[in-house]
Amino acid sequence: MGVVLFIFLVLFPLATLQLDPDQPVERYAENKQLLNPDERRGIILHALGQRVCCPPESCTDRCLCCLG
């Protein structure tokens, strides 16, 4: 029973954790916190597949163009 617990609680998470050696998780999370709230909102909505309403002069593929 102890071996099974060790495999599932220690080895399995280590095997599925894939870190890029040049960019640790702490640095990535810190960089995301430095974004302003509007940028974070845009990233989150883009990741969720939702589109943000933007002014017509700044239309991109990440947002919908609003009239007025």
Swiss-Prot record:
InterPro entries: Conotoxin (IPR004214)
Any one Gene Ontology molecular-function term assigned to this protein's record: ion channel inhibitor activity
The keyword Disulfide bond appears for this protein: yes
Source species, domain of life: Eukaryota
Subcellular location: Secreted
Pfam families associated with the record: Conotoxin
GO cellular component: extracellular region
Signal peptide annotation: 1-17
Propeptide part(s) removed at maturation, as residue ranges: 18-51
Tissues where the protein occurs: Expressed by the venom duct.
Cysteine-cysteine disulfides: 53-65, 54-63, 59-66
The entry's keywords: Amidation, Disulfide bond, Neurotoxin, Secreted, Signal, Toxin
Positions of modified residues (Leucine amide): 67
UniProt main location, coarse: secreted
This protein's domain notes: The cysteine framework is III (CC-C-C-CC). Classified in the M-1 branch, since 1 residue stands between the fourth and the fifth cysteine residues.
Family: Belongs to the conotoxin M superfamily.
Protein known as: Conotoxin PnMLKM-011
Organism: Conus pennaceus
